[in-house]
C-alpha cells in the first residue's frame, strides 16, 4: 500500500533477469539484423547487439539527463519537454508556508479560463503546491511553452458557498476581529494572509467588512515563470506519438525499436496515471 512495495516488486523481478546497472548508454545505432548499443562503465565502453530495443529511459524529470537525444539521433521526432505535476511558481503566500487548505482553482491564460480543479492547496513561500496546483501545472506549462504571456490563478476557499452564505456564516461567528473570523473557513495563518492580500487592516472589525472578507476567500494570484524541473514528477513532451504503432509501441520507421512510458509525449494527472501508462505501454 505504499511506494516502497512497488519498488520492492521491481527489485525482485529484476533479480530474476540479467541486468547491467551503472552503465550509461552513449549510442544507439542500426546494424544489419538489429541494433548496436554502446554503453560506458568504469571508463570502458562495451558494445551490445540486440534484435529489439525497448527505450524506457523516462525523461529529464526522472534523471536530469536528456536521454531522448539517443532517439532523435535516429531521426525520430520529439516535442520539447517542460515540467509538469510541479508547484506553480508564485510568491503571493509568502509567510504562510506549510499551511494547507481545500479550494477550487481556475487557471486563466491571457485572460481566458483554461483549466479548473478542486483539491488541497499547500502554501509555500515561493510557490502554490498541493494536489490542486500540481494538476493545473501541466496546462500551465504547455501554454507557457506555446507562448501564453500572462497567467492568473483564481482560488476559492469556500467553493460550496455563495457570497450571501459566506457573509451570513461570518456574521454569526462570535469572533469580532475581521482577520480572525476567517478561521471559519481556513487555518488562521492563511486567513491572516488572505485578509492582508485583500487590504483588510489588522484592527478591522468583522461586522464592518463582511463583503471584503468574502472577497478575501476568493483571491486571484499570478503565477510566473516555468515550474522547476527538479520539483516536477513528470514532463509534458517527449517522443512524438505519431511515430509509433499504438498497438505495439514499435517505431513506424525502425523495426525492432520500441518506446514506452514517459519517454513518449504522454502525461497524466496525479494519482498513479503516469505509472500506469508506463506499465501499460510496456505490456504492449
Segments (PLM) and residue ranges:
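Glycine-rich loop(s) and the adjacent beta-strand/alpha-helix scaffold that form part
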Residues: 52-94
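An anion/pyrophosphate-binding glycine-rich loop and adjacent beta-alpha core
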Residues: 76-82, 87-207
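A conserved FAD-binding loop/helix module that cradles the flavin
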Residues: 56-70, 74, 265-284
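Flavin (FAD/FMN) cofactor-binding core of flavoprotein oxidoreductases
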Residues: 1, 80-93, 98, 221, ...
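Short beta-strand to alpha-helix junction loop
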Residues: 1-12, 60-65, 90-93, 202-209
Amino acid at each position: 500500500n505504499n511506494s516502497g512495495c512497488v519498488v520492492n516488486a521491481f527489485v525482485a523481478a529484476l533479480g530474476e533477469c540479467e541486468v547491467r546497472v551503472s552503465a550509461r548508454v552513449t549510442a544507439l545505432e542500426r546494424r544489419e539484423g538489429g541494433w548496436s548499443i554502446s554503453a560506458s562503465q568504469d571508463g570502458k565502453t562495451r558494445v551490445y547487439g540486440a534484435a529489439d530495443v525497448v527505450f524506457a529511459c523516462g525523461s529529464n524529470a526522472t534523471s536530469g539527463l536528456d536521454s531522448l537525444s539517443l532517439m532523435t539521433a535516429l531521426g525520430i521526432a520529439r516535442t520539447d519537454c517542460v515540467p509538469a505535476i510541479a508547484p506553480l511558481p508564485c510568491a503571493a503566500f509568502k509567510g504562510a508556508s506549510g499551511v494547507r487548505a481545500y479550494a477550487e482553482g481556475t487557471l486563466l491564460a491571457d485572460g481566458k479560463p483554461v483549466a479548473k480543479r478542486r483539491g488541497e492547496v499547500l502554501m509555500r513561500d515561493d510557490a502554490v503546491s498541493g494536489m490542486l496546483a500540481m494538476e493545473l501545472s501541466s496546462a500551465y506549462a504547455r501554454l507557457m511553452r506555446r507562448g501564453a504571456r500572462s497567467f492568473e490563478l483564481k482560488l476559492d476557499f469556500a467553493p460550496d458557498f455563495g457570497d450571501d452564505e459566506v457573509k451570513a456564516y461570518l456574521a454569526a461567528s462570535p469572533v469580532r476581529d475581521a482577520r480572525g473570523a476567517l478561521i471559519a473557513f481556513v487555518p488562521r495563518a492563511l486567513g491572516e494572509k488572505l485578509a492582508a492580500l485583500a487590504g483588510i487592516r489588522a484592527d478591522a472589525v468583522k461586522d464592518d467588512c463582511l463583503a471584503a472578507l468574502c472577497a478575501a476567500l476568493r483571491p486571484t494570484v499570478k503565477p510566473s515563470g516555468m515550474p522547476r524541473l527538479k520539483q516536477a514528477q513528470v514532463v509534458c513532451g517527449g517522443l512524438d506519438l505519431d511515430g509509433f504503432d499504438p498497438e505495439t509501441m514499435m517505431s513506424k520507421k525502425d523495426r525492432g525499436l520500441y518506446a514506452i512510458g514517459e519517454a513518449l509525449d504522454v502525461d497524466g494527472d496525479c494519482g498513479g496515471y503516469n505509472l500506469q501508462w508506463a506499465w501499460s505501454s510496456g505490456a504492449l
